[in-house]
């Protein structure tokens, strides 16, 4: 109990560093998001113009683990952040715990322009990416086309080393699709022990060819670039840089998992009204959405965004119509509820082999 208390206090103290710089300002919103390219783009494209027009300052708080800090702030009653990034699965667990504000969509999207996928009760969709099959086109046998998960599982037609993410999440969905389950039915199937076993049995078929279980987002691209593996799952935004370096890799969008990221307002946020203003400003504007997508190819959902982008960039995006229609939407709520149960089964399965 004492260790838990210290951990909570440490998390709140870390979050408080962002607040201390903004504390003296009368109108300020503390926004927690990842840093790097995305954080810099948010500052330049959304934060600074918003402050110039409204007089409301945005104080960024960079974090790699928003869930732990949201939890700490809520359990201690010391809510420092106003807005935080939430992932496709953690948004459900945080909302169920009562840590997030249920959004008033009339303040963010009064004209109902945003698509349903961007309008979560507890978060506005800010970006999207896909986990897909990525292939070395020079390793595909002559006269053949690898275009589905069934092909990925076809070791006779498409021999060679493969790589998958070291997690049950999305691997089980891909396995069931390869086994003939319609994408719209995979979560119904995985909700049963029989469905999980079916997915693992399917994975057994290709297990000898999974030479690397990747654990970081850049790893499968490095494996593909070096030729250590021929086919792998990977996140779409990391593929284009390899293509620009003339590495012969290609995304297979068919059967990909589309994943949405969100911005949420914390329960008890000190600057709730100004937070709503910023969410509307940044995420319900096509021009700003297009500029953010040019900086990082994980598009948001503001109507008209796609048309403002160059055609060659459009076709690289998961929400480009031709790409979107062949994917399924990742169900974060399912994994928020079922990961502990399925992870135990997965861990036992992984211990049996490579």
PLM features: what roles do these ranges have?
Residues 1-9:
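Bacterial N-terminal signal peptides that target proteins for export
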Residues 18-24:
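Sec/Tat signal peptide C-region and signal peptidase I cleavage site
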Residues 25-94:
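Early extracytoplasmic/lumenal segment of secretory-pathway proteins
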Residues 33-43, 79-81, 85-223:
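Extracytoplasmic ligand-binding site segments that recognize negatively charged/polar headgroups
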Residues 91-93, 225, 231-248:
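A ligand-binding cleft/hinge motif common to bilobed small-molecule-binding domains
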Residues 113, 129, 197-206, 243-269:
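Periplasmic-binding protein-like
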Residues 261, 266-330:
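Mature extracytoplasmic/periplasmic domains
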Residues 322-354:
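Conserved C-terminal helix/tail region of periplasmic/extracytoplasmic solute-binding proteins
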